[in-house]
Amino acid sequence: MNSRRAKIIVDILMVIFLVLSFVRWEASSFAFHAIVGSACTLFFAMHIFIHRKWIKAVTKSCFAGKLNKALRWKYIIDMLLLVVWSVSILTGFIAIIPFLDEAAGISVWGRLHGITARIGLALVVVHVIQHLPQIKSYLGVKKGAKKKS
């Protein structure tokens, strides 16, 4: 499998599992949310691994002061995504413990998990919008191409 195809597959699966993780899990089950969230975490880690060279190069350029404004904003959003989703993932795993004890109710960790997940989702939307040219390129959409009627 080539690199471009791997990127597309990982990104599509990550988005699918991310959307599924926002399904009202009370209607399905906590186990469903935990499994889907864990799968999303796996694809998130794969996404970072696949793009590690870009991350390293842009980080180096950022600290050297060599980034243009647009790339600097992409980098800021990407780093916010990394921090917010890392907190969401960590608090998601910590929040499992009170759920094992039904009397404990929703913990501070569960609330923090929910808040960071929603912030993370908003940042994902911004991230996708910022990277639309690359996404279109991966999907083979030509710039200025019009659909045939």
Sequence positions of predicted segments:
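Membrane-embedded alpha-helical bundles that constitute the cytochrome b-like, heme-associated redox core
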Residues: 1-149
